[in-house]
Amino acid sequence: MRAAVWRFDQVDREGKVIRPSRGNAPQESAPRWLADHGVPLIKEKAITNNASPFQITNCDIFHPIYHERYLRFIRALGRSGIPALDAVKVAYLCDKSATNGEEGWTEADQPTSGEGWQRYRERLATWAEAFGPKRHVLMTVSSKPQVLAECYRLGIGQRNGFVEMYLGHLDNAAMGQAVDADGYLLIDDQCPPIANGYAWGDENEEYGRGWTARFGPYETFGHRYRESMLRALQMRRNYLLVDRSDLDPALLHYVCLELGRTIDDTPDAWCYLRETPTRQFPKGVRNFERWLHQRDRAGARTVAVDRYDIAKQNTHSFDFTARRTDAATGQYKIGFALDDRFLSGGPHRVVFKVTYRDEGRPIWRLAYDAPRAGSSPCRVECTGTGEIRTATFFRDDVRFGATGLDFDFAIEAERGDAMIKFVRVIRLGAATGGQGSPK
């Protein structure tokens, strides 16, 4: 719920007001009757790298006059019965900010000490009480560990608004994200909103042509869209707002089918073999993984390849979007470990889908454990087109006998080097995974 913005002025790229507020803009969410109660106003910093630059003036939402009336409103909302309606699927708990979403990130927006923190906690507790048994549909817009700990204690989820900056929050344990010593991006499935099925969302937006000032050439937006959508799935998000359906309709359709899936009911597991050196992790952050893991070790050490340059991102300047074997140094394999809860033992009926760059004339094969000798080989001979292609292999005899991060199967280069971008395992028939996250 938005209720903080008192004034919304349009400005130029230098922050000068060019179209002052008339007091009736849709962004001006604060009730006009507050003018009679002396609520202090806060003029925020102008946002000038937006498609349409603006400057917001907010109410001081933690001032006693505002705060007391805000809590009364939320209690009345709870008594109205509206939260119990089936139509209410998710609800954002907005704060205040200089940006257009009342999303907050500064200490003034989301205080974590003193009287401000006490009032912030009162806001959260009042929302939880108003929604009662449906409090799990509430989403704080904060990513601060202290705020999230309080939300999780109350049974409230979380929503970010900026997954298009797809390498944000790489190392935020409160959101289940970490980067290990080898650079692999990890996910903690026991993070409360993931484990307990709270609303757990994000927004993937800012893809119109007016956003080139922030993100660079429009022709690069398709890459950013794809990376962002896959990052949302890596984070186990179960809610996603998108503002474009035409950049990659097939990917959007896939994401819609995947959102909210757990290890128990997901039809597939996948690994995107990407790597990006960032300012925070200059040696590189590896892979987006969803229950399928790739790891380097002796005989299976890989090289990041297929570079895509980024025009304007404040975290990094390029992405590697594939990994290859390194036959010249005796590294002929790319090894994969499937989450034991997804499939273990066997034999199982599965589909392997391997997306690769058809560069040069290498030959590679998919090697897996099968109980019967003589199974037809899963072999690919590249033809040098330079295209991105996907090889699909249907198999009904696959055993996944390894445990943990030991390899269940591998891509093996027979001639030259295999350049692999994305590997997906689809289980056929009834789901046979172990115990996953509660629904």
Regions found by a protein language model. Name each.
Residues 158-291:
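Substrate-binding cleft of secreted/luminal carbohydrate-active enzymes
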Residues 362-374:
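Short, surface-exposed beta-strand/strand-loop-strand elements in extracellular ectodomains
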Residues 4, 355-361, 396-398:
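Solvent-exposed strand-to-loop "edge" motifs in beta-rich extracellular domains
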Residues 92-199:
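Substrate-binding cleft/loops of secretory-pathway carbohydrate-active enzymes
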Residues 268-343, 372, 426:
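Glycan-recognition and processing domains
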